[in-house]
Amino acid sequence: VSNFGNVQIYKSNNTKAQAWNFIKYESPRSQLDSMAKKYNADIQETTYVVQCYKNNNYSLGSSGSNVQISNSNQKWRIKKDSVGYITFINVSTNKALDVYGGHSSNSTNVWQYNYNNSLAQKWIAKKNSDGSLTFVSALDKNHVLDISGGLIQNRQNVQLYQNNGTNAQKFKLTKI
């Protein structure tokens, strides 16, 4: 058996060459929906400060429409949909945490935008073994909320980036 090997019809001989394993295909959307359902119970619909996991002095904030790390402790209200995705709504601006342009690629900016219930505004709060949370984008299971350059400092930009498990992608929620 090798890649690009020919398949042909042949009389049964009960060899491994004639044994098949069928794997159920699950679409990327279905995989994300399953993940959202799995982690749905870990988060309550209420208001939080979204803090950096390793440095409580910094949290998710905004400057105009852009989202960045700051020491302002801005409040975000979490709402859930029927599938299990969460949406962050900034209490001050009533705008949602949104992936700019709905593009799931490295370094795509995250900003605040009018709530529109799109996948660009939906997240999965995946609980990590160390107790932190990683926010997976509903656009792509491999892209998560990330602090640009891994620098946890005031006014550092927040973006979408491929999941790499670093502290720049770990957060904690403090209930208000």
Predicted regions and their residues:
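Lectin-like carbohydrate-binding module/patch detector with strong preference for beta-trefoil
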Residues: 1-176
